Amino acid sequence: MISRVTEALSKVKGSIGSNERHALPGVIGDDLLRFGKLPLCLFICIILTAVTVVTTAHHTRLLTAQREQLVLERDALDIEWRNLILEENALGDHSRVERIATEKLQMQHVDPSQENIVVQK
């Protein structure tokens, strides 16, 4: 650690004595690559983790909203199915069918003595 500081100070003293100009981004990048590899890697990992957390939270919210909509649709279909069952039972009621047959179609009960049985060969 002390050698690093000494090296950095000697560079600074050397650059002060000379008229050489250094670009600040280049100095920062050089310093990061030389002495800050671990913090730089950790910083990149933190940024990637944060982006992943935000993306996951967004997808979770979308899926939760979609699930709620599907639950509402399922409930509506369940109500419609129950109404259709009731309608089927009402329309298939024997007394209703018999009443329609006698009133609208003028059908009558057949006397067993008037029945004809047809046998097909």
Curated annotation (Swiss-Prot):
Membrane topology summary: Single-pass type II membrane protein
Taxonomic superkingdom: Bacteria
Cytoplasmic side of membrane: 1-34
GO CC terms, sorted: cell division site; plasma membrane
The keyword Mitochondrion belongs to this UniProt entry's keyword annotation: no
Entry's transmembrane regions: 35-57
An individual GO BP term: FtsZ-dependent cytokinesis
Residue numbers on the Periplasmic membrane side: 58-121
Keywords, sorted A to Z: Cell cycle, Cell division, Cell inner membrane, Cell membrane, Membrane, Transmembrane, Transmembrane helix
Compartments where found: Cell inner membrane
Function text: Essential cell division protein. May link together the upstream cell division proteins, which are predominantly cytoplasmic, with the downstream cell division proteins, which are predominantly periplasmic.
Family membership: Belongs to the FtsL family.
Subunit structure: Part of a complex composed of FtsB, FtsL and FtsQ.
Protein name: Cell division protein FtsL
Gene name in the database record: ftsL
